[in-house]
């Protein structure tokens, strides 16, 4: 593994071969996909921390979805080396969808874990409330809620380290960066899915309250040929909760579409 930077965006690069660029969600970092890398031999796995998250500092301008998309587009061009597989979780799936719609010739495939096409009005308000909480009280309450409510009880029982890992991922976020990321998602508009041309795999949990199976299927219905996999007894943090299943599904998908 090597660390690098594209501008002020810090990235980790593992392996060699065709590029897979991973985009984490709210409260996540490049580490959100660490458990999937073992199944991806023969690929170059590129994992950035989005601006204001993880080790990437906040820029001088406010965080927006447009900035996130531009950041990943910059990474794809400068590190990807050509058409690239995109993988996202939660907020990161919307970044991937937007980029794939804008630059279809650059995207070999999409893999979306816990996808968000566009926040509902109630979700937008919850995101604004979460931003306010981060600024006023820091990350403790948000981290507790994410680690207790974001994962399924079965996943927590099977892996005692899961909830603490999700909690720590949130606790290490810069509160202002997290708040601005929430606001960016709260004002986001969805991608025009008619412009998607790449093979698309959507993976969600049957207990995912953020991206329930019905929402995942609604996205798939608008993307020609998209496939949906629903993992049983799984919440929103799919790569954490079902790493073996997610690694297998991702590996099969990118390998099947490597010549796309």
Language model regions located:
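Conserved acidic catalytic loop of the alpha/beta-hydrolase fold
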Residues: 67-84
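Catalytic histidine-centered segment of alpha/beta-hydrolase-like enzymes
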Residues: 234-243, 247
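Gly/Ala-rich beta-loop-alpha elbow adjacent to hydrolase catalytic centers
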Residues: 88, 92, 96
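Conserved HGGG/HGGXW glycine-rich cap/lid loop of the alpha/beta-hydrolase fold
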Residues: 9-57
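Flexible "cap/lid" loop of the alpha/beta hydrolase fold
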Residues: 97-102, 106-141
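Alpha/beta-hydrolase fold catalytic core
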Residues: 1-20, 41-44, 80-82, 172, ...
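Conserved alpha/beta-hydrolase catalytic His-Asp/Glu region
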Residues: 118-125, 137-195
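Short beta-strand/loop motif that positions the catalytic acidic residue
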Residues: 196, 202-204, 208
């Amino acid at each position: 593994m090597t660390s690098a930077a594209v501008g002020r965006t810090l990235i980790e690069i593992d392996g060699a071969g065709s590029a897979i660029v991973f985009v984490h969600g709210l409260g996540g970092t490049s580490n959100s996909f660490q458990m999937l890398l073992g199944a991806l031999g023969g690929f170059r796995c590129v994992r950035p921390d989005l601006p204001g998250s993880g080790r990437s500092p906040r820029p001088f301008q406010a965080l927006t979805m447009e900035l996130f998309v531009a950041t990943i587009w910059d990474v794809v061009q400068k590190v990807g080396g050509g058409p690239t597989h995109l993988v996202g979780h939660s907020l990161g799936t919307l970044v991937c969808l937007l980029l794939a719609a804008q630059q279809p010739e650059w995207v070999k495939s999409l893999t979306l874990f816990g996808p968000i096409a566009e926040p509902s009005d109630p979700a937008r308000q919850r995101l604004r409330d979460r931003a306010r909480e981060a600024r006023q009280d820091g990350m403790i309450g948000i981290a507790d809620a994410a680690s207790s409510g974001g994962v399924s009880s079965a996943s927590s029982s099977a892996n005692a380290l899961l909830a603490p890992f999700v909690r720590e991922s949130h606790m290490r976020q810069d509160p202002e960066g997290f708040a601005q990321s929430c606001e960016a998602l709260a004002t986001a508009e969805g991608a025009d899915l008619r412009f998607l041309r790449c093979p698309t795999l959507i993976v969600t949990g049957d207990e995912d309250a953020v991206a329930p199976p019905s929402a995942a299927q609604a996205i798939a219905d608008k993307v020609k040929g998209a496939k949906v996999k629903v993992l049983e007894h799984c919440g929103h943090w799919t790569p954490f909760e079902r790493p073996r299943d997610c690694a297998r599904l991702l590996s099969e998908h990118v390998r099947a579409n490597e010549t796309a």
